[in-house]
Amino acid sequence: MKSSGSARATRRNAVSSSSAPAHAEPPARRAAKPARKLDGAAARPLAPTNAASAKPQGRTREDKDRPLFEDIRYLGRLLGDVVREQEGDAVFDVVETIRQTAVKFRREDDKAAAQTLEKMLRKLTPEQTVSVVRAFSYFSHLANIAEDRHHNRRRRIHALAGSAAQAGTVAYALDKLKQAGDASSKTIKQFFEGALIVPVLTAHPTEVQRKSILDAQHDIARLLAERDQPLTARELAHNEALLRARVTTLWQTRMLRDARLTVADEIENALSYYRATFLDELPALYADIEEALAEHGLRARVPAFFQMGSWIGGDRDGNPNVTAATLDEAISRQAAVIFEHYLEQVHKLGAELSVSNLLVGASDALKALAAASPDQSPHRVDEPYRRALIGVYTRLAASARVRLGEGTVPVRSAGRGAAPVRATPYADAEEFAADLRVLTDSLALHHGESLATPRLAPLMRAAEVFGFHLASIDLRQSSDIHEAVVAELLARGGVEADYAALPEADKLRVLLAALADPRPLRSPYLDYSDLAKSELGVLERAHAIRAQFGARAVRNYIISHTETVSDLVEVLLLQKETGLFEGTLGTPHANARNGLMVIPLFETIADLRNASDIMRAFFALPGVGELLAHQGHEQEVMLGYSDSNKDGGFLTSNWELYRAELALVDLFDERGIKLRLFHGRGGTVGRGGGPTYQAILSQPPGTVNGQIRLTEQGEVIASKFANPEIGRRNLETVVAATLEATLAPHSNAPKQLPAFEAAMQTLSDAAMASYRALVYETPGFTDYFFSSTPITEIAELNIGSRPASRKLQDPKNRKIEDLRAIPWGFSWGQCRLLLTGWYGFGSAVAAYLDGAPDAAERGKRVALLKKMNKTWPFFANLLSNMDMVLAKTDLAVASRYAQLVADKKLRKHVFERIVAEWHRTADALAEITGAHARLAANPLLARSIKNRFPYLDPLNHLQVELIKRHRAGDTNARLRRGIHLTINGIAAGLRNTG
């Protein structure tokens, strides 16, 4: 962070020499004409303007990345200026000294630097500490903006140069399939007709950024992008002034909310990404897909196969703050956002479509739509499109009013005529889309197709995708809660006194009898527990929401901790009691159907192993076949990555997920049922995170089949979707990977697959034994974990709407088993060990190779592992993700966290085991891949880490110091705030490691 305010500051680099090549001088960007150079501010042309120079010869990676280094330096200098201006020289100098000392500690594992750093941090006042934390946190955010800008810049340069389509795009997928002979027009058409892709946004306790911060960062990204265009000296100076103002705004804006987060905050946070990205970029993605298809000879309008989902407001698992009221608030706020978008777009269309029937004709349907409009203006008599749009606008406004209440959505004057509230509301979004189609068809018939492209076509696509609900809200609750409510209903109804105590077979007998009986269990004359009333209230509200906003608004019910068939049937019974289940189950001609699909979530290793058996038994129940028929012979199954990882470790979790998927595919194929997998992936590799493209392509053969749902966890939503261009790219990646995985499943089925799978099973068994030996069988490990990570502070600070577990507040009784998977993985990321993404692999490979009877057999086993990496996407993706995690670990920084463990013997024993396993894992990875340097195969990520981590390390050192003070009894509010800031800053710096 270099300030330009003094000679002393000029000698300091905004980015340490570890962060950028020595030749990357502070930017001197060219203006449009050779004017005076501004201090680091001249504009840079985006790309060569002629074809000859569009493909420069001999450019190195450093040449290509020079604009990125310049941007990072430039933003760092602006931030340095602001810190000096706002906080003074003393704070600025402290920030710089801490950075330099931390870099020395990182590079050289310098013990003297560590002692100097510790003394320096100990001397900081609470006020200084917060300022220093904010400085490094904001630099992480600014570096992320620069990286995103560079990704967009490189893609645009590729496009301008006419380069081949890049991996992860639909165009690339189509080219690849065509070359393999898998891309006939009929095949592609069938894929899109049967496809369903749904990213599902979830909340996360540490990554709910304030809208004020997001808005400022969005402006900074936009202004930074402007600097790639030729600018005059005056324009450049104006741009820098605006950038400086927005960085100052960031500095003077609270990073954190004052009050504890509520579900409402989480809802609003998610909605900000719809406004910033999804509302515009998802329709644009559809247009890109259709353009790519047209280039391959398939001119067709694809169905609305890509939709959005959400858990926010509907996920009750472990969060009693999610109720019928929050579900209602979630759908109401979602609907308000989409109605506002529709109304604004229709209003703008009214201004743009000034087409006169004196000059060009219109279809009869369009004329009828115009005639039905309340508009009476004599000035628009010959403008049927405008008149029709006024009618559409008034009906939309009325639709919002009847669903959300008067004044919820801003409504403009629709011109002369009837007030919007008097119009007939649309029955549903399909009716609204049908009116838009009338306009589109009429324009197409009368030489006006180009008029629909800019706004009308995206609006019609939005109506098809978002409906009146914006995103489908999933309901989720734990199976033990369902059992408690069902037991209460059965007991109060005099059916079964102690349902919970029954063996599984008897539970099913009781449940099926209740579902075959048209009479409800619930009585209006009986009182029920608060739990029962709350759970049933959520389902009743879901029933009302479906009637109000359409069946897509709430259509799935996820059952956490599914361990038995009765866990699924209980939710069918709860639907019956709340109007969501029609008919009677298992009786002839009863036309039984459930409104919400019951979706099991298999989470632990044991549950994954039992998944196919549970589903087989469920399908065999009387009447379930009829329910499946009403679902289009489709059934969704959710797989949990987080809990299986906490249970069995990284390698075993991935392997058992793979095996469970294959077993489910075999069962569903046997029964003629279409399987849709819902992947509960987190941000961390330990929670199933990592690059989405490779993750989907590495799925077992036959498991994607055109349909996939996957969670977009709250801790990575900002990095993936805050920038619209990056957001569209991430959305397209999911489509491209699903297309490839569906139509070329053989790419993940190499010839030696049986031998590969046998080796994986051996590795998995050894890895799980190693992992569990550390986590669950090492005496004192629980104390080590709670002392050496910020897990206690995360719990005490009550970050997020989900309350902290009371069990974790009692040191005598807390267990790893009681810890939720998200804070488990998150805490290991904060202390820079990221243990959940690699531990056990080194021991597993060592055991596998050492188990060979002789050197020749050992050589064969090494060769097999190398072949697995080269030809089996599943294994290659697993190693690639592990490589990324190992690159992000820092044993030197982690050793500082280990010092928080008071018991020296325990500290030494556990930390040395972790360090030894890290080296075993790194050695095993090197032997298999042949690469001894981290991320040798991923220079872009290696560069990213190199740029960012010198500014991340100080946040870790500060966090350790603040935790020490906090645990020593310091109750200063600024100290607690500082800890929270470091948590957010480290998460931002690690990006996909939340």
Swiss-Prot record:
It is an enzyme of class 4 (lyase). It holds the Pfam family PEPcase. It catalyses: oxaloacetate + phosphate = phosphoenolpyruvate + hydrogencarbonate. Disulfide bonds: none annotated. Keywords: Carbon dioxide fixation, Lyase, Magnesium. InterPro entries: PEP_COase, PEP_COase_bac/pln-type, PEP_COase_Lys_AS, PEPCASE_His_AS, Pyrv/PenolPyrv_kinase-like_dom. GO terms for molecular function: magnesium ion binding; phosphoenolpyruvate carboxylase activity. Its EC number is 4.1.1.31. Its cofactor is Mg(2+). Residues 14-25, 41-54 have a biased composition (Low complexity). GO terms for biological process: carbon fixation; oxaloacetate metabolic process; tricarboxylic acid cycle. Residues 1-66 are annotated as: Disordered. One of its GO terms (cellular component) is cytosol. It comes from the Bacteria. The active site is at H204, K646. Forms oxaloacetate, a four-carbon dicarboxylic acid source for the tricarboxylic acid cycle. HAMAP family: PEPcase_type1. Belongs to the PEPCase type 1 family. This is Phosphoenolpyruvate carboxylase. It comes from Burkholderia mallei (strain ATCC 23344). The lineage of its organism: Bacteria, Pseudomonadati, Pseudomonadota, Betaproteobacteria, Burkholderiales. The gene is ppc.
